[in-house]
Amino acid sequence: MRKEYLLLDRVQGPLVVLSEVEGVAYDEIVEIKIANGETKKGRVVQLQGDKAVIQVFESTTGMSLQNTTISFTGKPLEISLSREVLGREFNGIGEAIDGRGEIYSLKKYNVNGRPINPVARKYPRNFIQTGISSIDCLTTLIRGQKLPIFSGNGMPHNELAAQIIRQAKIGGGDGEEKFAVVFAAMGIKHDDKEFFRKKFEEAGVIDRLVMFTNLADDPIVERITTPRAALTTAEYLAFEEGMHILVIMTDITNYCEALRELSSSREEVPSRKGYPGYLYSDLASLYERAGMMEGKDGSITQLPILTMPNDDITHPIPDLTGYITEGQIVLSRDLSGKNIYPPVNILPSLSRLMKDGIGEGYTREDHAEVSNQLFASYSYVQDVISLSQVIGEDELSPVDKIYMEFGREFESKFLNQGFEDNRSIDETLDLAWEILSILPKSQLDRVSPEALEKHYRGDK
């Protein structure tokens, strides 16, 4: 028999404070019945003596201190999961919002999950093909990796996310029926939601997609649980159904802003730029749920997207994210201004696990050499551009002029590709050789003579 409590101490924003509670646990879910008979959900976020602080998942409008009844369920937030979640859409606490009814299963799953034992982790290998040359060739996404995309306000990260969801497929000989995408949207606008849904329906990928949606006008408390519900679903599909899951979460910045707002409501001591001191560990509790496990066939790969405030890569959100994840894909406003899509700035971008998931048996034997040469050559192009701004392009040496041509071709043909352009890894590497062949053979010092003999298409 559950005990019910009447009379609240205080209502402050999304928080409710209750006194004289007994046997209550942290993170426990509560049911709140207000005077008009409406029932809301909340969770315990703080315990001090006999006082409990509760976050309400919906608005606290209409709650009075005298006529509100609270009962504790004795359980954390749990969601029902089965393979039937594929093709469905849910809100941030795992409730179906697509009008097709609830998911029924014999077992419910705690959205907080649990970290994978390091001893049980399997080293990530095998790449996931996104169909985007700048990612597949230069910052390869490896199965089981966590690789964030650093973007900025007004940049085409929504289009990039939609394109990856439409085009992504696994390599290594596993069937496509074992691959699915879990998409978590946090604090997005209504028109962004309609954009995603329209693109997914047009591409026919709904049947291998699970959506968790928290809109900008939805409760911020729900924004905190959205990625956790999505990752719990991914863990179920990966480790109980044996599927390979790509989790795309956007926008992590909105999640962190919600965390800061709730921390402020709880009157916690702020850290850098007002964010709570536990921001690092909180983000780690999300990112570290990616990976592969020994004895399990499935995998979870994360591609979180965050918008850097003022394009500042040293801001706490991208800064702390970079410490936890295994690289980053950085979008450039300068490239976007040149109408290059996707505007991936390859020089600060990095995939730390790329080296172990490419090459013969994974992609192609020349992949690593081509990638290294493109990085080196494009880096030198930036030096040549800086020099040309001082002395003028006409005064450059003949070799430097060739590098300028290489840089223009690299940006316009390799980095730039249409929203509907889906390139295989072989097409990407062949295109890379075509552009590298603009340079003299003597300048291609990052590739082996055998690779040059086989793939070089220039005259020298």
Curated annotation (Swiss-Prot):
This is V-type ATP synthase beta chain 2. The keyword Transcription does not apply. GO terms for biological process: proton motive force-driven plasma membrane ATP synthesis. Belongs to the ATPase alpha/beta chains family. One of its GO terms (molecular function) is proton-transporting ATPase activity, rotational mechanism. Keywords: ATP synthesis, Hydrogen ion transport, Ion transport, Transport. Coiled coil: none annotated. Produces ATP from ADP in the presence of a proton gradient across the membrane. The V-type beta chain is a regulatory subunit. Pfam families: ATP-synt_ab, ATP-synt_ab_N, ATP-synt_VA_C. The keyword Flavoprotein does not apply. Gene3D superfamilies: 3.40.50.12240. It comes from Clostridium tetani (strain Massachusetts / E88). HAMAP family: ATP_synth_B_arch (MF_00310). InterPro entries: ATP-synt_VA_C, ATPase_a/bsu_AS, ATPase_F1/V1/A1_a/bsu_N, ATPase_F1/V1/A1_a/bsu_nucl-bd, P-loop_NTPase, V-ATPase_su_B/beta.
